[in-house]
Amino acid sequence: YQLGGITPLTKDMTRNIIPTETWSSMLSLVLCALVLVIIFRSLPYGLITLTVALAGIAAEIGFLRIMNWPLDIMTSLVSALVIGVGVNFGILFTYRYIQEMRDGKQGPGDAISSTMNNLGRANVIAAVTTVAAFVIVMFSGIVPLRRFGGVTAVAITICMVTSLTLMPALLYLMSKRAERRAAAVPESEPEPQVT
């Protein structure tokens, strides 16, 4: 005989969350990486853009561990949200940076500075309003909803911080490395003209 009702059903669902969540998050990240590489036509740009989402997921897992909260039905939804928000922040920053490099004919440092001036404030405002909405969810009387709000707020905050710190640093280093490589390649001598 087996017990029926909501308790065994919830227990069974909770037991299946971790492998399902791990698999779906990994698949989402791989597909996002593929799309980003195609959009930017560059493996480095695609992977650097994805770092924002990766930092958000790491923050989610770390915060759950620190708070000793279980991965339940509500907190398992956070990864999907964080991947979406993180990739969005990353795309906006990378796209603007590439535009600044092409249109402004400036070096990586100036392009990062221009990108931060034009986009940094907008990203911060977008993140703060989103985080504020999830902080409000933390005042819910339902414990899983409170956890969901807290974990999501922390993860989105980390996405914002990453998009304004780590990501610009990686873009700068990548561009400087490309400049050094281009400078190391000797220009070919022009062929003599035969008249």
Give the predicted meaning of each segment.
Residues Y1-T195:
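Membrane-embedded transmembrane helical bundles of large multi-pass transporters/channels
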